[in-house]
């Protein structure tokens, strides 16, 4: 592998020490750009997971009875589901915008980073709300909610932690 073939080797140079990004902003873009696709895929996956969690939760809320009626007919449950749907739609809009920009070949590091940050937080919150609505059943494997909660917890870590996403966003904003 030559430095021309290996972006990280080219970026590090012969000394092996990576130069400060402030010194070579074009190199920073070359190194960070491939991560955009990974983060975009994570955002897309989270959007799908959120949609599925909402569907499963609504179905459960219409099926589960308490005090002679489905729990989905109680205001508190409706409010939880409304919050879940709102978070999911906002995350979907950010993700679709980032995907459009990426597809058009535009510089979209900021938008992709925002989509990754927001979707991973949202899917974790939605999984938690779904678990709350399912109650004890949410811990049982046959409902799949316990797995969704575990899977959602990886999002704020994998592909760059939330803190890394915030650092990237701060830099793209000139800070």
Model-assigned labels for residue ranges:
Residues 4-27, 33-175:
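Alpha-helical interface subdomain recognition
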């Amino acid at each position: 592998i030559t430095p021309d073939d290996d972006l990280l080797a080219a970026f590090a140079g012969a000394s092996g020490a990576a130069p400060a990004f402030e010194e070579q902003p074009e190199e920073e873009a070359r190194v960070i750009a491939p991560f955009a696709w990974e983060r975009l895929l994570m955002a897309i996956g989270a959007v799908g997971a959120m949609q599925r969690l909402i569907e499963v939760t609504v179905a459960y809320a219409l099926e589960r009875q308490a005090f002679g009626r489905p729990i989905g007919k109680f205001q508190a449950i409706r409010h939880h589901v409304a919050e879940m749907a709102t978070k999911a739609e906002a995350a979907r809009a950010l993700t679709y915008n980032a995907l459009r920009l990426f597809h058009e070949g535009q510089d979209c590091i900021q938008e992709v980073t925002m989509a990754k940050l927001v979707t991973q937080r949202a899917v974790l919150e939605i999984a938690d709300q779904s678990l709350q609505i399912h109650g004890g059943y949410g811990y049982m494997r046959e409902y799949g909610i316990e797995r969704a909660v575990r899977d959602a917890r990886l999002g704020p870590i994998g592909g760059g932690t939330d803190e890394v996403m915030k650092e990237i966003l701060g830099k793209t904003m000139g800070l």
